Amino acid sequence: MSMFNKIVKEFQWGQHTVRMETGEIARQAGGAVLVDVEDTVVLATVVAAKNPKPGQDFFPLTVDYIEKTYAAGKIPGGFFKREGRPSENETLTSRLIDRPLRPLFPEGFYNDVQVVIHVVSLNPEVPADIPALIGASAALAVSGIPFNGPVGAARVGYKDGQYLLNPTRSQLATSDLDLVVAGTERAVLMVESEANQLSEDVMLGAVVYGHEQMQIAINAIHELVREGGKPEWDWAPAAKNEPLIAKVTEVALPLLQEAYQLRQKSARSQKLKEVNANVAAALAAAGVEADKVEVGNIMFDLEAKIVRGQVLAGEPRIDGRDTRTVRPIEIRSSVLPRAHGSALFTRGETQALVVATLGTKSDEQIIDALAGEYRDRFMLHYNMPPFATGETGRVGSPKRREIGHGRLAKRALIPVLPKDDEFAYTIRLVSEITESNGSSSMASVCGGCLALMDAGVPVKAHVAGVAMGLILEGNKFAVLTDILGDEDHLGDMDFKVAGTDNGITALQMDIKVQGITKEIMQVALAQAREGRLHILHKMQEAMGHARTELSAHAPRMITMKIHPDKIREVIGKGGSTIQALTKETGTTIDIQEDGTITIASTSTDGMAEAKRRIEGITAEAEVGKIYAGTVLKLLDFGAIVNILPGKDGLLHISEIVNERVKDIKDWLKEGQQVRVKLIQADEKGRLRLSLKAALTEEGGSISPINAGEAAAPAAPAEGSEQQ
């Protein structure tokens, strides 16, 4: 009899067979599920603390998605040969899993929960993020931890008017859409997507299609729980302290209503601090001993009630706008004189300074991904220092949020970038958030597009982004355009839409409640389009098209092609030739395996010289041509003459002049410049040269050395070549 109570569920999901099992591996974890999708295998585990930490005032959920290099049959690089800090993909996937799980934990549950997903086997054609999300959901479901799941997920592609369920990497390469949707049986909770300027209807259809198709995975998790799930925790939220709620409401409600009439964020924030201090003082005076966490939760509920009530009643929003108005926009380009391109995009109290830098092929980011190494020619880095919100805090390496926001902005801009053969530069955008009050990632999209245009990148169209919010109470709802930070915090849905005049390029949606219908999403997307077009109009007014000239400080590039067999001649022994070339001409030279050479420099003369020298190095000697050569070495029977870089030939003593030559030193010396004709090249590459043939053809003459230096030949014949 086996020591394991192993439960296995298998189902067909589109073109893939999915296998889920629990009960054999990681049995001491709260829940553990192994998910296998066509040889991509993930182990998802969850552990929760039995009690919350004292004074805990938020839900401490941690999700760690970890790719093991052995999953792809690799050994890690570096000195230690171990997996190191999380890659960008691991960080983004951790966030992708966290977002749909977090809203499903019950209110008041403050126990530490850690979800860890290991990728232990990888089929390069099957991305591991969807199996990881399903595995995390299943592990939570079988653990018995308080969780209102399970969650399902699906990836949706779009090609030739048809939706694709969980497309392979090869299919994604030609798809117009890469959309991940996650949700429960009843509702969509999360959407993350990149699209090639698709319409709102196509995007909404993809969300609905994905939600329908994920139900088979949700049903399989239910079956797994029925057969192998652990008992549910005996947990209930703490009973509400009604006397405390009444006291806090009595003191705080009128003051909070005053605070939310203040339109300036700084003034409102200061007023809210005063309200909190007044509440604490009133409770102390009344002799009420209250937990700070409990009071904070009551205050949050009161703030949400005020803000949401105002919007649903048709009253002005926190900053005085109606539900459809975008905040005032100011745009300035070429902000930084030495940068290749820059733009300052300000929308209300959110501001992004975005800077574009152009580089060469050698500046591309080399990413050693689990599925294989690849190069990325477009980078977008998002930074939000604490001063952007008027706070002090840590400054250093980017946090998960910054990596996620940068990735969203990058997704939005990728579809409008020129192809590599149209614009060979490597591009780096950096978005410095200098002020933040909501929607800083979408400000990065707008500022990023303008910075690219300022740098002279021929983007296909302007791209703008807008953050939308939603407030839902029963059958009443309101969609908010261009939300503030407080509206994001107090609302039920935060979704960001970026795109051009023609369609959507990126969509990110996070829904905190169940009950958001297709119709509500349809209204929200239509209103988002209205806001996006308004912002696009402002951007087009500020900068109608990309600059036709690059910045004087940006490198120029020329591209040339050589035969791949000649690459080693250009590189030279130990890189000596190319190192000398780059140093002497002040250029950067990149050579591809197919023989494509890119020469970059801020000096056009330097580029021209580098190109001329490479052409000389790779030139083929042609029989019948006359060359300007240099005598390298004298022999008894002739001389070795260099006619091209790396191309030496024999000038036989009989080919110097028509008369008999007794001693070659009477006619030639080492270092002497001579005009010679290539008269023969054999299959081994040996060259035979003739000085007398060149003299005859060009009408020149030569005298013995003791009678003076060689006479200058006549003008070269047409078609001859001179180094």
UniProtKB/Swiss-Prot annotation:
Residues annotated to bind Mg(2+): 488, 494
Start and end residues of each stretch annotated as Disordered = 701-723
| Low complexity bias locations | 707-723
Q: Where, per UniProt, does this protein localize?
A: Cytoplasm
What InterPro entries has UniProt attached to this entry?
A: ExoRNase_PH_dom1, ExoRNase_PH_dom2, ExoRNase_PH_dom2_sf, KH_dom, KH_dom_type_1, KH_dom_type_1_sf, NA-bd_OB-fold, PNPase
Q: Which residues form the S1 motif domain?
A: 624-692
Annotated Pfam families:
KH_1, PNPase, RNase_PH, RNase_PH_C, S1
Q: Per the UniProt entry, what is one GO biological process?
A: mRNA catabolic process
Residues of the KH domain: 555-614
Identify its protein family.
Belongs to the polyribonucleotide nucleotidyltransferase family.
* HAMAP family hit by this protein: PNPase (MF_01595)
Q: What does this protein do?
A: Involved in mRNA degradation. Catalyzes the phosphorolysis of single-stranded polyribonucleotides processively in the 3'- to 5'-direction.
The name under which this protein is listed is Polyribonucleotide nucleotidyltransferase
- Its source organism is Cupriavidus necator (strain ATCC 17699 / DSM 428 / KCTC 22496 / NCIMB 10442 / H16 / Stanier 337)
Q: Which gene encodes it?
A: pnp
